[in-house]
Amino acid sequence: NEDELFDSISKSFTLKLKIVVDNIESSFEINLREFANLYDVNLEKSKISFAFNKSTIIFSELEIETNEEIRIIETMTPKMVLALKSYGFDSLFVNFTNFIKLNRYYLHYIGISKSQDSFSRLVVKPHDKRLRILSNENTFDKNTRLTDEIMLLFFKIEPFRIQIVNNTIDNSLNYTRLISDAEKAFISILNSDYNKIKYKDYPKTNDGLYNDNFTGYSYKLGNLLTLVTSDTTITGDMFSEYNLMCENADTIMIQGDSVELISNNSGEK
């Protein structure tokens, strides 16, 4: 509604928007002052203009007196909105409804990069699983291409807290083994379709953390998103200085020879 749009801008300097996917409707507001801060727009000398193009918003910076375009600030799509919100830009996107329900991804494949960066491994060079997914899968929306729907999600493994009870245990943590262990943990629990090796014996591994003598440890997704496979669903929570333990995230718990997914039902799934 155009009247509501300009009313929200004039009163609260926010841009009210809506994303609809299938039967899920999500409304939110873009805080334009935060947007200006994020993209270094001096609101005393410039103003923000925006234009809609299908499902895209084009933000521009204009000179106040002449109204001349200085630059295109950002071309924002629903994917970008979800990604930024997922990575913690809470002050930029406010009053977001049904976010967890909307920010769901069907997970096809899990992999790690040991000798090169993930972008080079997946995009720059031909990657067997990525090519198979593009060849075999169908789109959810008949009006889009599969390349428009595929998302590459990159995660950094961050060890948060290690409590040493027995001083005879070496408290150093090998990062390569940690990454390898995390990959196997998620594959064994989520059973993603294009991972041929399922690691059914996990946590027993030769290159993971099994032999590091930990009493127990766990993995959580530190982002506000949900990963879905044919077998199960796992939901994350935003990691921040105010939410160090990702309280609302599901947990992959490893103790001894056992591994299980502990679901947190406090949030929307």
PLM features: what roles do these ranges have?
Residues 1-269:
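Boundary/linker segments flanking structured domains
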